[in-house]
Amino acid sequence: MEEKRLSAKKGLPPGTLVYTGKYREDFEIEVMNYSIEEFREFKTTDVESVLPFRDSSTPTWINITGIHRTDVVQRVGEFFGIHPLVLEDILNVHQRPKVEFFENYVFIVLKMFTYDKNLHELESEQVSLILTKNCVLMFQEKIGDVFDPVRERIRYNRGIIRKKRADYLLYSLIDALVDDYFVLLEKIDDEIDVLEEEVLERPEKETVQRTHQLKRNLVELRKTIWPLREVLSSLYRDVPPLIEKETVPYFRDVYDHTIQIADTVETFRDIVSGLLDVYLSSVSNKTNEVMKVLTIIATIFMPLTFIAGIYGMNFEYMPELRWKWGYPVVLAVMGVIAVIMVVYFKKKKWL
């Protein structure tokens, strides 16, 4: 089914839950509850079975995949006391990254990207996070994400994640998402290297199309990174009560990573813009080379055509026409002229 546009919400009152993304069959709820000593994980499609974790005394990660199920989003929102406008933003997948602070929770919108090597396109997916006292709610559009490293650390008690509260889980999820941006930038860097080689050695129409697509990808990435910097800046500067002081340096570290990513994106944009200029210059040079060859050929044939034109005149008294060696002599003269001109052009380095 086609993706709904924002116009689908026209005329509806604020807080009306309308999903604006692509409808998919995927739907599941993943729950990970843990402490230093214990760990519990399960998947379900029954929303009622996960609601009791709201009052858990240990950190819980509830990942809801398939937000086209607006009834599930509404039920979770009602039970956890989430504002209707926040639920509306969760279902409106065209949000820019942002953070909003409420009395009992923190709401964050992020973007997750996947790179299609065949189409050379970025596909974005909105990921919404809600931090409560002991719980992190995550809302995704489809199955498949970049958070498996976090899952592994929780399952096998690696690092300090199971010694920390839910705010550290929130940091870990954001950090995993930002780390994936570095992987994405490596793929884009490889694509730039390939395009540079093609532009310099064998520029084709497909090359410039891929270059334009790469430029669009970088613009899309830039539109995500810049507001993400504001999100992380708010998390470590305007520290909400739900985030402990010990966790603040971790958010500052992720913020530093976003600055590095933003700088890399700007560098890549400059390189790609330069590639387009190089492509146009290469095409222009090839055209000039062709025109030069054609001009030289035309110049060589000008005196030959002149000689042929003289002897093509229909005058009755032209002595050379009746001369036995006239024809081979004229051909020889024309050949000598052509050779002299070719030698002259090579001496001038025009050939």
Curated annotation (Swiss-Prot):
Effect seen on changing F315W: No effect on pentamerization. Increases ion transport
Membrane topology category: Multi-pass membrane protein
Gene3D superfamilies: CorA soluble domain-like, Magnesium transport protein CorA, transmembrane region
One term under GO cellular component: plasma membrane
Activity regulation summary: Inhibited by cobalt hexaammine.
SUPFAM superfamilies in alphabetical order: CorA soluble domain-like, Magnesium transport protein CorA, transmembrane region
Phenotypic consequence of M291A: No effect on ion transport
Protein family: Belongs to the CorA metal ion transporter (MIT) (TC 1.A.35) family.
Name the record gives this protein: Cobalt/magnesium transport protein CorA
Organism: Thermotoga maritima (strain ATCC 43589 / DSM 3109 / JCM 10099 / NBRC 100826 / MSB8)
Gene from which this protein is expressed: corA
